[in-house]
């Protein structure tokens, strides 16, 4: 439920016709900022910022709870952190808090980005690859303009994971009189060389797609192969080796869920069988000039069926000659882990834009809380910058996180004077903060009760309730939680 406040003065729009991705988010508002100068010095005009609100702002405007989304997230908190959102007993209690989530610049989900008009002018066309570099600091500054327009005088707490954790840390520098508490989760004080390198590899996947066209592609012909490959690469950094091994091992997928990337598949019949195995999963055109000509086998059957994961996608079972006695002796060449990655890649390209992916990953690269905050000769600039954060902080980390390591969470907690570090127990890796709802919910609730007693002690409008998360009823579009059994792939 999006709640408009009577104090709002800036213009709002209900839709963004040029951007097909913004329509994926229900019940969001888009506010237009007349002018905004980025950290780089570039000035944008008529800047859209998408956001959602839930709950009621207190008369004194001091019960706002700001939630910050991750790289591919949106302003729809209910989608990716839904089990934490609700009433008493849930961390994001809308009977106590006015919950606000704002979309970051560069994202395709409503805020200014590659898929919105330049300066809001249809005659200028879309930004495309000409959308300027934005930083995490740009996000929090423009978001504050929206929060001010909503009548928010003080933020009770800011919570965010991954990229959202970066925004959470930056919010703290507005000072303790404006932001009372922060909860950075599975994030970093500055983007590491490891993360920068993964972002570069993912961008190169997009650049290598012939359909990328230097960023001047159409919505009808996007670089889907490159973006899908980037997503697969990213997903491996979001999970852990042990997570994939326990879920998939060397399982062979159910044939009915085999991912058909090209619409139809060449049957692996002699003489093209080896070629087909070699190119399995390639998203290019199967009819290359050097591909072998099909040859009719002695006997074969072709079974057409509908892939249950992709409505309307036709796939065909593989067939081999019935006279081939060695078929059962051949090793498996297609595994459940591959099937799952292809499924995730295909799902992602339907909801995200390649130029936006490039823009957001470059935004992450700029993140460094010590920039312009530490002395030039400082021996530990990050520690010096973190020491300036005055709010109480709850830092949540994941031991199995190979992307934003637990050591990085310790660095944050050790640098912030009034902090406490808690561990999310999970083998799932980085994405555990979007999967382990019970643990995240309990840690945040305990922290809020400690540092926000005036808000948490109020009798909620819905009455008392036992601590606990809501039930996950559908797979997340913008997060990682899934209701289906992914081990079936």
From Swiss-Prot:
Enzyme nomenclature, EC number: 2.3.1.31
Broad enzyme group: transferase
Keywords annotated in UniProt: Acyltransferase, Amino-acid biosynthesis, Methionine biosynthesis, Transferase
Domain AB hydrolase-1: 63-435
Pfam families (UniProt xref): Abhydrolase_1
Domain of life (superkingdom): Eukaryota
Statement: the UniProt record of this protein carries the keyword Transferase: yes
Presence of the UniProt keyword Acyltransferase in the record: yes
Region (Disordered): 247-272
SUPFAM superfamilies (UniProt xref): alpha/beta-Hydrolases
Active-site positions on this chain: 162, 162 (nucleophile), 401, 430
Catalytic activity: L-homoserine + acetyl-CoA = O-acetyl-L-homoserine + CoA
Gene Ontology MF terms: homoserine O-acetyltransferase activity
Recorded metabolic or biological pathway in which this protein acts: Amino-acid biosynthesis; L-methionine biosynthesis via de novo pathway; O-acetyl-L-homoserine from L-homoserine: step 1/1
Signal peptide coordinates: none
Disulfide bonds: none
UniProt GO BP: 'de novo' L-methionine biosynthetic process; homoserine metabolic process; methionine biosynthetic process; methionine metabolic process
Family statement: Belongs to the AB hydrolase superfamily. MetX family.
NCBIfam families from the UniProt entry: homoserO_Ac_trn
Protein function: Commits homoserine to the methionine biosynthesis pathway by catalyzing its O-acetylation.
Name the record gives this protein: Homoserine O-acetyltransferase
Organism: Emericella nidulans (strain FGSC A4 / ATCC 38163 / CBS 112.46 / NRRL 194 / M139)
